[in-house]
């Protein structure tokens, strides 16, 4: 299913909690070339207790998303949650449940968004200092908010191999024999936890310690990211509700592509990268090249996520096999199979898609049809095309960027599109 180029060396990495290995690839044709970094002047530092800026710098320079980098981001998350807990404690002991849910969710993940913010900043001449670490950490809180809300909207049972937050609260409601609906209680708790993550993300970003002029440059993209993600989420639920029968394959593809762009690609890669670069004072031409790199790579990243949602190993992805089929997600794979399969098979596929009681046999049949219809190969080709477009845009920006950072971004392009979780 996954074709690894002979020019790519495959390495195993782990996420921040030592689980869920994913494929990391290092381009053998792009050797590391040291380059003296340009630096912005020192920032005053964050308002809260800092983690080790020296450790962050070492972690960044040792590997784009290695164990040291992930450990440093995790330590920053833990420190910030501890600070916020101090504000929750006087309200009521039960309020700590919100922090518990957030902390549990944020123990996992690959820290992609902090990585792209960091390398965007360094690429444009910024420093991997304490202020940048805190800004990068804000991306994780923002993603946690999106995941908490997304699991509610998708009615997901699990996230990263454990019960989704709304399921945990619903079960707690049952165990304590509370009044009312357990499901409504769980949904309300997850929504509030997601809202709180948005608050904490904004606090982490605005108080990160960047100089006022850096924040003035970066803040518009931060605001745009938040607005566009919410619009993308709405497009996703609208796309799931609107009928497809009257649409041809091109119209379906356009709907799916637009959702991918605004729900995933921009906030996963393009916007974190640009926030970091904007803070460092990137010039307009280089910024456009970085934007093109981030958008195309973000689209490829989401397409890989769609493939894993159908073919991924549950022990690695933390999601049940074929979970996207059970949830009825209208992805590029679905567009492809409906266009490529014979009418009878396409009709059966449509009938099964989104069935909560989808059997293992039906899941296998649907996966096989996606493969035999050519949809899987088409998506793999599109992943390669988008990644190549991203790398071409990065090459156009190379002359004005830090060389070491460019090599890291090349490496990240392969890592994000050739992974197993």
Located regions from the model:
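Active-site alpha-helical segments that house and flank conserved acidic catalytic motifs
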Residues: 132-162, 220-232, 266, 270-277, ...
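Histidine/acidic-rich helix-loop-helix segments that form or flank divalent-metal centers
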Residues: 210-230, 235, 247, 283-286, ...
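Inter-helical turn/loop segments and adjacent helix faces that build the functional surface
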Residues: 123-128, 203-221, 241-255, 274-290, ...
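Divalent-cation-assisted or electrostatically stabilized phosphate/pyrophosphate-binding catalytic cores
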Residues: 160-194, 245-265, 288, 314-340, ...
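C-terminal helix-coil-helix/basic helical segment that borders enzyme active sites and/or dimer interfaces
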Residues: 125, 242, 274-285, 308-316, ...
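Short hairpin/turn module used for nucleic-acid contact or packing/dimerization
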Residues: 363-421
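Short glycine/serine- and small hydrophobic-enriched flexible loop segments
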Residues: 118-122, 147, 199-207, 274-278, ...
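Conserved N-terminal diphosphate/IPP-binding helix and adjacent helical/loop segment
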Residues: 2, 9-17, 21-144, 148-149, ...
């Amino acid at each position: 299913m996954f074709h690894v180029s002979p020019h790519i060396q495959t390495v195993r990495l782990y996420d921040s909690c030592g689980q869920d290995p994913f494929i990391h690839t290092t381009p053998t044709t792009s050797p590391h070339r040291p380059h003296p970094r340009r630096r912005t002047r020192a920032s005053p530092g964050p308002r809260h207790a800092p983690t080790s800026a020296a450790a962050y710098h070492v972690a960044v320079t040792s590997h784009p998303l290695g164990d040291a980098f992930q450990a440093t981001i995790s330590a920053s998350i833990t420190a910030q949650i501890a600070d916020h807990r101090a504000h929750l404690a006087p309200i009521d002991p039960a309020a700590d449940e919100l922090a518990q849910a957030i902390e549990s969710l944020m123990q996992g993940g690959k820290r992609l968004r902090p990585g792209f913010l960091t390398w965007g900043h360094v690429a444009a001449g910024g420093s991997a200092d304490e202020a940048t670490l805190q800004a990068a950490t804000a991306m994780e809180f923002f993603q946690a908010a999106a995941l908490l809300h997304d699991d509610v909207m998708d009615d997901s049972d699990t996230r990263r191999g454990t019960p989704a937050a709304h399921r945990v609260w619903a079960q707690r409601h049952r165990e304590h024999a509370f009044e009312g609906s357990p499901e409504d209680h769980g949904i309300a708790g997850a929504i509030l936890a997601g809202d709180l993550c948005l608050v904490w993300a904004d606090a982490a970003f605005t108080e990160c310690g960047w100089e006022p002029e850096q924040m003035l440059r970066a803040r518009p993209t931060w605001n745009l990211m938040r607005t566009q993600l919410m619009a993308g989420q709405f497009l996703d639920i609208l796309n799931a509700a609107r009928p497809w029968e009257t649409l041809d394959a091109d119209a379906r593809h356009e709907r799916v592509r637009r959702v991918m762009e605004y729900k995933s690609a921009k906030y996963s890669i393009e916007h974190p990268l640009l926030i970091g670069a904007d803070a460092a004072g990137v010039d307009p031409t280089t910024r456009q090249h970085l934007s093109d790199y981030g958008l195309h790579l973000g689209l490829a990243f989401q397409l890989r996520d769609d493939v894993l949602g159908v073919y991924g190993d549950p022990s690695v992805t933390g999601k049940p096999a074929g979970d996207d089929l059970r949830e009825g997600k209208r992805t590029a794979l679905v567009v492809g199979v409906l266009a490529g399969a014979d009418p009878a098979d396409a009709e059966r596929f449509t009938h099964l898609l989104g069935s909560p009681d989808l059997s293992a046999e039906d899941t296998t049949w649907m996966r096989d049809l996606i493969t035999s219809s050519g949809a899987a190969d088409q998506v793999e080709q599109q992943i390669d095309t988008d990644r190549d477009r991203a790398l071409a845009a990065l090459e156009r920006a190379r002359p004005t960027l830090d060389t070491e950072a460019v090599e890291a971004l090349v490496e990240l392009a392969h890592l994000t599109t050739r992974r197993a979780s």
